[in-house]
């Protein structure tokens, strides 16, 4: 059976699940729409659903399911003729992040580089999406102790792209928190420099242009453990409380 499904409806429903932090509903949503996409033969819709599944299973630490969905999504990129397109880059970034998360950093770097080439071909390098690529790639480089390259990418993402285009205070905060880890990993005596970076991250976390939505709650939950790690427990607890309040209201 060939047809098309309403993929924007799927995204809206899945976003609603994540805004409530309802992982059970998110899983059911993904499974339902994956089945619909397969039954209708809508490969483009299936690619979107599988890409969301990759992120979901990574988030819930389901290694086998994440890698299986990732493998099929990469096959669909080729089948649909998207290897040099921005839509293909999105799949590569998600796959690379997943490989890195599950300890396959070198394989992940190869896909980050493929994604970067897509952005370069499309002249799309001064964008939020490209900054997100650099942020994720920097995390992988840091895990491999390639500190100079990681710092280069985090600085480019935060200082040279996100600050320039504006409106992404949460993502800048995440970049700074990761930069604090890099600084400490490279030199465990660099307390003063780490504190300065975290102070700047805290300012961005509390920026007036932050919309107090599910994405903001995600930023808070992502940053809180790092503040705990660096013994800034009061700020970490404050972030967790605000995130909890946001999720409870939705």
Where are these regions (language model features)?
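Flexible inter-repeat linkers and adjacent short helices
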Residues: 1-51, 56-62, 250
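Conserved alpha-helical positions within TPR/SEL1-like repeat arrays
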Residues: 11-21, 45-59, 86-101, 128-143, ...
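TPR-repeat structural position
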Residues: 23, 43, 63, 70, ...
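Amphipathic alpha-helical segments of tetratricopeptide repeats
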Residues: 31-36, 74-79, 113-121, 155-163, ...
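Short coil/turn linkers that connect adjacent helices within long alpha-helical scaffolds
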Residues: 39-42, 79-83, 121-125, 163-168, ...
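Short coil/turn linking the two alpha-helices of tandem helical-hairpin repeats
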Residues: 81, 96, 123, 165, ...
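TPR/TPR-like (Sel1-like) alpha-helical repeat modules
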Residues: 155, 199-203, 227-249
């Amino acid at each position: 059976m060939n047809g098309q499904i309403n993929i924007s409806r799927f995204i809206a429903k899945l976003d609603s699940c994540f805004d409530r932090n309802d992982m059970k509903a998110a899983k059911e949503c993904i499974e339902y729409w994956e089945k619909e996409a397969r039954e209708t033969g809508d490969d483009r819709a299936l690619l979107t659903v599988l890409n969301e599944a990759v992120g979901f299973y990574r988030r819930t630490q389901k290694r086998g399911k994440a890698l299986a969905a990732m493998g099929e999504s990469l096959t669909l990129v080729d089948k649909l003729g998207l290897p040099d397109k921005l839509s293909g880059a999105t799949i590569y970034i998600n796959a690379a992040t997943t490989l890195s998360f599950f300890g396959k950093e070198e394989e992940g770097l190869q896909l980050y580089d493929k994604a970067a080439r897509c952005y370069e071909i499309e002249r799309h390098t001064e964008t939020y999406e490209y900054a997100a690529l650099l942020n994720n790639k920097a995390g992988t480089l840091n895990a491999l102790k390639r500190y100079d390259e990681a710092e280069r990418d985090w600085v480019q993402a935060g200082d040279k792209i996100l600050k320039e285009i504006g409106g992404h205070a949460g993502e800048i905060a995440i970049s700074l928190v990761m930069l604090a880890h890099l600084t400490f990993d490279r030199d465990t005596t660099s307390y003063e420099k780490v504190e300065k970076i975290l102070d700047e991250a805290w300012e961005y976390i509390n920026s007036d242009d932050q919309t107090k939505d599910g994405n903001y709650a995600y930023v808070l939950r992502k940053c809180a453990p790092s503040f705990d790690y660096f013994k800034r427990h009061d700020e970490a607890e404050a972030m967790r409380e605000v995130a909890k309040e946001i999720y409870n209201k939705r």
